[in-house]
Amino acid sequence: MAAPALRLCHIAFHVPAGQPLARNLQRLFGFQPLASREVDGWRQLALRSGDAVFLVNEGAGSGEPLYGLDPRHAVPSATNLCFDVADAGAATRELAALGCSVPVPPVRVRDAQGAATYAVVSSPAGILSLTLLERAGYRGPFLPGFRPVSSAPGPGWVSRVDHLTLACTPGSSPTLLRWFHDCLGFCHLPLSPGEDPELGLEMTAGFGLGGLRLTALQAQPGSIVPTLVLAESLPGATTRQDQVEQFLARHKGPGLQHVGLYTPNIVEATEGVATAGGQFLAPPGAYYQQPGKERQIRAAGHEPHLLARQGILLDGDKGKFLLQVFTKSLFTEDTFFLELIQRQGATGFGQGNIRALWQSVQEQSARSQEA
């Protein structure tokens, strides 16, 4: 591995001026302003909930936004993952030697609280770039060059980023897996026993409906980096596009489809987001009527009617449970969305929940196409 990722610093978004992403993250999801910067046509605002940090780059300028790269993309998007590394300069040289494109070579930024060095590397996942950040000893609340923003404590619905899911073009997952392994030290994380890394977890949606391939990757032991999930469509759909294909079409290529945000109390968080005006995908109508589902929900210590009312999915086995709920898209282009996830001992991703998400997004997509 050339540049092992040690920690996820933040996820960056690029949106046009006036797009409400930053406002909605605060109003609907309980994120609080952390630091800001306005210069050269850019308004950069970092927002935080627990250890989860989103950097919203709004507008456009003649230069590049600090700690990132302007993708000049046609639609709003999550465009950058920023990782802490031990030595940004050395990491950049090693990645360049592997053939990686480095559109922003190492830059050192300093303010009264200390200094940081960063470089930006292109990835094979469409417009998604990766920032390699070295900030040991920096004392400020975010990064050099940003002005701290005072804010009241948030509701604490989200404590950290649990996983990141990339929507990929068909057949590209093995290439992406090797790239993240060779460049950042990620390794294959099986989602099912005996899983072939080249094939991942394959799930069919039924005759004429295609299916989904998921490949999970985890960073090296001891790092504080979310799981990375690669999602691609399987051939076989003969009717409408599935949600991965729709993402690729509407996003104009592969990219970050959703971020899973860990919550210590998914019932409370979902209720709070819904009360604030956030919208969630409705699970398939028969989800809560599956044989044994009510018993499983009660075994996890929850009330079936509460989960059903809020659209929370639950999967588990041998006393370990996984609860998930998915928002509608945060962009009018119907691309990027968020997931709230609570783990009660479970470390993977419930296949039952994955199938239910697939079906619920398909149903939502069908309604959108018919509207």
Swiss-Prot record:
Changing residue 266 to T: In NEDSWMA; uncertain significance. InterPro entries: 4OHPhenylPyrv_dOase, 4OHPhenylPyrv_dOase_C, 4OHPhenylPyrv_dOase_N, Glyas_Bleomycin-R_OHBP_Dase, VOC. Its main location: mitochondrion. GO terms for biological process: aromatic amino acid metabolic process. The keyword Protein biosynthesis does not apply. Fe cation binds at residues 163, 258, 339. The keyword Cell membrane does not apply. It is found in: Mitochondrion. Its EC number is 1.13.11.46. Changing residue 179 to C: In NEDSWMA; uncertain significance; decreased protein abundance. Keywords: Dioxygenase, Disease variant, Hereditary spastic paraplegia, Intellectual disability, Iron, Metal-binding, Mitochondrion, Neurodegeneration, Oxidoreductase, Repeat. It comes from the Eukaryota. Residues 7-135, 160-328 form the VOC domain. Its cofactor is Fe cation. It is linked to Neurodevelopmental disorder with progressive spasticity and brain white matter abnormalities: An autosomal recessive neurodevelopmental disorder characterized by developmental delay manifesting in infancy, inability to walk independently, mild to severe intellectual disability, poor overall growth, progressive microcephaly, and axial hypotonia. Additional variable features include brainstem and cerebellar involvement, seizures, joint contractures, ocular disturbances, episodic respiratory failure, and facial dysmorphism. Belongs to the 4HPPD family. This is 4-hydroxyphenylpyruvate dioxygenase-like protein. It comes from Homo sapiens (Human).
